Amino acid sequence: MSIASTQADKKSSNHPDKIKISGVILVDKPQGMTSQQVVSKVKYLFKSPNHDSKKAGHTGTLDPMATGLLPICLGEATKFSHYQLDADKSYQATILLGSQTDTGDADGQVTAEATISAFDDTMLDKIAQQFLGAQQQIPPMYSALKKDGKKLYEYARAGIEVDRPPRDIILKAIELKAIDEQQIQLTVTCSKGTYVRVLAEDIAKAIGTLGHLTALSRLQVGDFKIDETITLANLEALALEQRQTYLLPVDACIDINAELTLSSEQCERVQMGQRLNVIDQLTNDLQSYITSAIEQHLSTSNKNAAVNQNVEDDNDDNDDNDDNDDNDDNDDNDDNDDNAQQLLHEIPVDIRLIDEHGTFIGLGAVSLNGRLQPKKLIQL
């Protein structure tokens, strides 16, 4: 069970007279505002003489021109915002063909123009298929990425173009539909780090022309959807108590299903940062979850590392080996297997920590050997 944001409100240690507001709110970002401006506005709206969130942050930037879903974390929820930074995102955009801008969207200056060849939805379907899957994308100059401690858009505004290494992205779903002879509607679900502005330019090139975005709306972030949002105007029109009803629990951003229930004594110990031995509390389901998480981690991070392991030189294959040597080799392999198994049992996996009342108290890292390390805990 998750702790509700209104239940999580506690006295701030720095301001004992103020109740700390914690939770996640899904805002429909208006056009023309930066993401940080929206965060500052929301933080202000949850502040009163008796209330304060202390901290606030979003889970992924939207350009000023863009609208749509912007999850904002307040108070204790900011500790878990990074889980949504890594989540897949869905967008709907409008591409205007025939011209390119320096920013890749309608906020920039037109830098080049081109004629538009005839196209239809059949052609667009074929082009969309070309963009599906894993690929690399070069970030735009007008972005907040940094090079040598300086943001790329600062170089761009100074008329300087710098090399940007391509980044791995995945387009998991994409649809292109003709709006008219000059405009295309793009709907895409993509991995983190994908720039829809760059994708729009690449699609225009595939059609045989140039293009830039004239509209962009984020529809989904992880499991959060646009129809669950509230506009800033509507939020501002509410009283503080009504605003709090739109807050999701502090752990709403966390996409971890496994949980471990701790006794009151164990809760006190983890709140003090102490490690626990919970080997007797690891159910079969929890052990299976940890094992699966370890296997998934190893397959993604070490998929190329294992290729060259245990490869012998051709000359070594021709060496004379007696029975004793063979037995020694088998003994060595057994030792290696034992060591590898021991290491696997020590790999920590993040899980939810729950108290005896079913209240979420934070995250811990637990391994198959039963060691639990407190990781991110909320201040109760």
UniProtKB/Swiss-Prot annotation:
Query: Where on the tree of life does the source sit, at the highest rank?
Result: Bacteria
Top-level EC class as recorded in UniProt: isomerase
Please give the Pfam families that the UniProt record associates with this protein: TruB-C_2 (PF09157), TruB_C_2 (PF16198), TruB_N (PF01509)
Which reaction does this chain catalyze?
A: uridine(55) in tRNA = pseudouridine(55) in tRNA
- What is the documented function of this protein? Responsible for synthesis of pseudouridine from uracil-55 in the psi GC loop of transfer RNAs.
Please state the Enzyme Commission number of this protein.
Answer: 5.4.99.25
tRNA processing keyword on record: yes
Q: Which gene encodes it?
A: truB
Q: Which family does it belong to?
A: Belongs to the pseudouridine synthase TruB family. Type 1 subfamily.
Q: Where is the composition biased (Acidic residues)?
A: 311-338
Record field: transmembrane: none
Organism phylogeny: Bacteria, Pseudomonadati, Pseudomonadota, Gammaproteobacteria, Moraxellales
The positions flagged as active site in the entry are: 63 (nucleophile)
Q: Which named protein is this?
A: tRNA pseudouridine synthase B
Task: Using the UniProt annotation, give all residue ranges assigned to the region (Disordered).
Answer: 309-339
Show the CDD domains listed in the entry: PseudoU_synth_EcTruB
Q: Which GO terms describe its biological process?
A: mRNA pseudouridine synthesis; tRNA pseudouridine synthesis
- Which HAMAP family does its entry note? TruB_bact (MF_01080)
User: Is ATP-binding found in the keyword set?
Assistant: no
- NCBIfam families attached to this UniProt entry: TruB (TIGR00431)
Q: What SUPFAM superfamilies is this protein classified in?
A: Pseudouridine synthase (SSF55120)
Q: Name one GO molecular function term.
A: RNA binding
